[in-house]
Amino acid sequence: MTSLVEQIVRCPTKSAWGCSPKFVNLRDLYVGKKEAPIGDLEKERRLNLNTQVSLDNITITAYIQSKWLQSLKDLVENNIAITMKLATTDRFEAYTQDVGRVVLLMQYDKIKGQAFNARPFRLEFNPNKLRPVDKSILGTIIAYLEDISISRADLAFDLFELDCSNFILEKKGKGVATKEFRSKDDKLETKYLGASRSEKQIRLYNKKLEQLSSGTESEKQFASQFKNWWRLEFQLRNRAVDEIFTVINEIIFKPNNFENLTLESQIYLSAMLHDKSTWRRVHRNTRSKYKKMLDTYQTSEIDYLAEMKNLLKERREKLETELAFYAGKFVGQ
């Protein structure tokens, strides 16, 4: 079976690097947002949602083509934007940085690669953080690589002016490890579905709060313009990367509002969401009944998850092209 990026065979844009996607910064997406030709009602809802989707953290591993190994070393050693942390004959580590933060991390370890039968070169970056100089370096490096594998890709939905502190985030089907962090007044700040080292982990967190507490000055300024800014993020590793456009179908995401249900139903749903130890003692048929109710019961006029799926469908071709570029599918075209 071919992987996701191997199914993409055409590229709409050309550059000096060969074939590349159009890089778009998250801030540009928000400020210069253009609506697709959709119906008035759906368009109004989309405008109210102010939602954007983008690729976030990316990790690729690869082999360096032998004929380009010296060229890559020269690039890393001589480019003024690159800081060399470590350099030996068979190993180096280097990075670009902006405001004291690593933007593009480059690691090469030939001996370790041979010892573990693994690709020896590794690149880590966040597409939303790349500056023009980083994009230029990235494009040059990708052209030097072969047998590229995307070992991590994050898909991020930014939800502007939507308070998700009382939203439900659950996985359909079999449960997974869950962790929550709440404020002093018991409002949700962060929720994790799945273990941090698993192939899939889903995060919902208060992005505005995170940016204001640990962002750069420009990031804090950007975040300050919003009353609410939340992010729903899907972190995928290894084989799960191929599920990047379908993993959203595995979750339940909606406001926590069951006031119109019977008291009995509300109690069962509350136990499922907030008292896992008690919930495990409930008969499996009852658990199945209320898990289905949680999934299908409409808790608000807007189906937020459906709107996010529609947005992903609209942006899928662009995101596929971007992923394929990182995987080196367009080099030399």
Map each language-model feature to its residues:
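Structured, helix-rich domain cores that form ligand/interaction pockets
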Residues: 2-282, 297-333
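Helix-turn-helix DNA-binding segment
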Residues: 287-292
